[in-house]
Amino acid sequence: MGRLAERFPNMSWIIAHAGGSYAFAEEVASCIVEHPNVYAELTLTPVTNRVVEYLVEATDDEHVLFGTDAPMRDPRQQLGWVLWADLPMESKGKVLGLNFKRIVDRALRP
């Protein structure tokens, strides 16, 4: 992903299932730190305790995106992982939708 992010710096890259394991979350976080156009999407978070907090702390609250994996997973559970995360409400708002809105708004600019 890093090579693609470098090659296409004006494109936003979203890595899905970033919460699937601690090892993968670490790889994703490293990629985000090196490439500001890369984002972590939070599906599969129920399998890793505190991964939402880890990704925000390892990167920032501007590069983490909410995801549900619905209909495979109950979206209420996925929402709960963010709502109960030990993060400021402002960060939760960014993760739950403001970050994605910013990406879409930027992509729609002429």
PLM region descriptions:
Residues 1-65:
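Catalytic pocket-lining loop regions of alpha/beta-barrel enzymes
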Residues 18, 45, 72, 89-90:
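A generic helix-loop boundary/linker signal
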Residues 58-63, 73-110:
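Mid-to-C-terminal alpha-helical segments outside catalytic/metal-binding sites
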Residues 69:
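Active-site glycine-centered loops adjacent to acidic/histidine catalytic or metal-binding residues
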